[in-house]
Amino acid sequence: MTQESINQPIVVAALYKFVTLSDYVAFREPLLQAMVDNGIKGTLLIADEGINGTVSGSREGIDGLMAWLKSDPRLIDIDHKESYCDEQPFYRTKVKLKKEIVTLGVEGVDPNKSVGTYVEPKDWNDLITDPEVLLIDTRNDYEVSIGTFEGAIDPKTTSFREFPEYIKAHFDPAVHKKVAMFCTGGIRCEKASSYMLGEGFEEVYHLKGGILKYLEEVPEQESQWRGECFVFDNRVTVRHDLTEGDYDQCHACRTPISAEDRASEHYAPGVSCPHCWDSLSEKTRRSAIDRQKQIELAKARNQPHPIGRNYRLPSEA
């Protein structure tokens, strides 16, 4: 057991695997029961194409859930990344049925049949510093604004669904021979690599395990990462050492907010921030004020408040 895990007893596990789960509807109930039995909070998405999600629990609980998943031969090599925190980052336990575990919205894209070349974190720096490589961040604009890799292109998308149109409008397989992509945990860039191959791009690479695995394995002094990394739970962001970062998140617009944002006259905790204060409807503002009062009351009673934040997984973002 590491000192970090002793000081921060909650394990946060981001996991996914593209694999054919033709029985995913029937798989939901036993999976949910396994989460409950192991005291796991968080959300897992399942579809015919696989499983995806982020969950949290005790060391024993996470180990128990992973052992249960790996007892299914289809999931024996399921990928997951771990970090730690000192309190539960999720309030509920859910398993959702989906058409896609990460929504690209393009028919025929199947990572179970075709994906790009996985690149280990230790080899990533050599790849992305190659001047012939086009480096693309597949995440949303609000994620990129907090941190990204040196020299990465920001597509400025607000949803992963917009990624295909961005590629079609800006890049040509005949011109852009080498493409490298990355995302938070590896799932979006893996699916994007399948799409890119289908569009005729020949050399397509993606970061295995995503940014989180890179931050875990690559020493900060050697890192090409700049800033913090957005995560889809109550921590909002993590630093290079995977400890909780300096950002909060606006409850109204979900934009990550910095200390400077919180000092703004347009920031009202739980209600608005400099990014949305002038665009909220009066109905939304009143609802946010009422919700914030409930949150503060729950805190005063030392009780968790289940609607304190409304987080989405990358597949739903």
UniProtKB/Swiss-Prot annotation:
Q: Where is this region: Disordered?
A: 298-317
UniProt-listed Gene3D superfamilies = 3.30.70.100, Rhodanese-like domain (3.40.250.10)
EC code: 1.14.-.-
Write down the SUPFAM superfamilies for this protein, in alphabetical order.
Rhodanese/Cell cycle control phosphatase (SSF52821)
Write down the SMART domains for this protein, in alphabetical order. RHOD (SM00450)
Q: Which UniProt keywords apply?
A: Oxidoreductase, tRNA processing
InterPro entries cross-referenced by the UniProt entry: Rhodanese-like_dom, Rhodanese-like_dom_sf, TrhO, TRHO_N
Q: What one GO molecular function would you report for this record?
A: oxidoreductase activity, acting on paired donors, with incorporation or reduction of molecular oxygen
Which catalytic residues are annotated?
C183 (cysteine persulfide intermediate)
| Superkingdom per UniProt | Bacteria
- Residues forming the Rhodanese domain are 129-223
Q: Which reaction does it catalyse?
A: uridine(34) in tRNA + AH2 + O2 = 5-hydroxyuridine(34) in tRNA + A + H2O
Keyword tRNA processing listed? The answer is yes
Q: For this chain's UniProt record, which GO biological process terms are given?
A: tRNA modification
Protein purpose = Catalyzes oxygen-dependent 5-hydroxyuridine (ho5U) modification at position 34 in tRNAs.
Q: Record's NCBIfam families? A: PRK00142.1-4
- Which family is this sequence assigned to? Belongs to the TrhO family.
Protein name in UniProt: tRNA uridine(34) hydroxylase
